[in-house]
A protein has these predicted regions:
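Alpha-helical transmembrane segments in inner-membrane proteins
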Residues: 1-357
Length: 357
């Protein structure tokens, strides 16, 4: 066997081990999700062991007759909607953040870069403070739909601006920032004229909350998350090419501008679908993809699913901490995501010597 053949075999083996490492990371995150679900479901006013939780989940789907009615009610009607909601939201923001960073070629990008959070906040403030909704009626449905509608307005503005000329990623970011400041100013003006009770409700919504998530909410968020993730996975190779630069993408037959617009639409719909139900939960879409990228690199074929799994773990753990740190009072989950994610991210960033991009 020649020296060249030996080198080729060694390279193939290294690539195989590197791929295995990526798959193992995703599997470990999935196992962590299962463990966190079991433990989080034990936290509440009534004591339920983790074994009882797993048993109830098993019997609930396999043999419902064997379920303890009290435990089943506490687990499936009270605790699991919030837990599964955290899983879906964390996955959605992780995927959207990974795609946004790759699309924009900007390590500071996240799902809210295009102004989605400010648009949603404006819509929620309109609904809560002034009772103005897109449905014409007050209530949770009006709030959700109004927040969803206005969260998509900034992305629509960016798309319209981009249609006038082939704008770069930097221009799209700047347009998003401009719209964000406009919506923030409008939101502040509304807050100046609403009651203290409404102002408190707006604040609670703006810091992110999983406690009001229902199974129907989970179903809608899951639909957007699964569909968006599947489409982004199908586009992952094109996204890898886009990272190398618009000129290289064009040379390989890709229309970088159209691809970026398509990605922006998908990411915006994913982020809007969770923000309208849970409020603004920050840091997940920024930190989760970064941490995954440190371990697995920037190949979106693995980065996207790994960011989904790690984002779910990160948000579920943050929500768990928010429920127990000063129980029975709940801290805003957005505060905990920052406290957990920021030190973890800084530590890994300082420790990591090789470039991630």
């Amino acid at each position: 066997m020649s020296l060249e053949e030996l080198d080729n075999e060694e390279m193939v083996e290294k690539y195989r081990l590197y791929t295995l490492k990526k798959i193992l990371f995703i599997v470990m995150c999935i196992i962590a999700v299962v463990v966190v679900i079991g433990y989080a479901a034990t936290i509440g006013s009534s004591d339920i062991s983790a074994i009882d939780v797993y048993r109830d989940i098993w019997y609930h789907f396999i043999d419902p007759i064997k379920c303890d009615e009290t435990i089943d009610w506490a687990v499936f009607d009270i605790r699991l909607p919030r837990i599964i909601g955290g899983l879906i939201v964390g996955s959605c923001l992780g995927v959207a953040g990974a795609a946004m960073q790759s699309m924009m070629k900007n390590p500071l990008a996240d799902p809210y870069t295009t102004g989605i959070s400010s648009g949603a906040s404006f819509g929620a403030t309109l609904a809560i403070g002034l009772g103005i909704t897109v449905t014409g009626s007050a209530g949770s449905l009006g709030l959700i739909l109004t927040a969803f509608f206005f969260s998509l307005v900034p992305a629509t503005v960016i798309i319209l601006v981009s249609s006038l000329r082939n704008t770069s990623a930097a221009t799209m970011i700047l347009a998003g920032i401009a719209v964000m400041y406009l919506f923030n100013a409008c939101t502040t003006l509304i807050k100046l004229g609403i009651s203290d009770e409404s102002l408190s409700a707006v604040f609670q919504w703006s810091v992110g909350d999983l406690s009001q998530v229902t199974w129907s909410n989970c179903a809608i968020m899951c639909l957007f998350t699964l569909a968006g993730t599947a489409i982004l996975m199908a586009m992952s190779k094109k996204l890898n090419i886009l990272i190398t630069g618009d000129k290289n993408a064009t040379a390989l037959g890709l229309n970088a501008h159209r691809l970026r617009i398509a990605l922006l639409i998908i990411i915006s719909l994913m982020a809007a679908s969770v923000v309208c139900f849970t409020g603004i939960i920050g840091f997940i879409g920024l930190v989760a993809p970064h941490i995954v990228r440190i371990f697995l690199g920037s190949d979106n074929r693995y980065l996207i699913p790994a960011s989904a799994a790690f984002g779910a773990v990160l948000l579920m753990v943050a929500d768990l901490v928010s429920r127990v740190v000063i129980a029975p009072t709940f801290l805003p989950v957005g505060v905990i995501t920052a406290f957990i994610g920021c030190p973890m991210f800084l530590y890994l960033l300082i420790k990591q010597r090789r470039t991630m991009w």
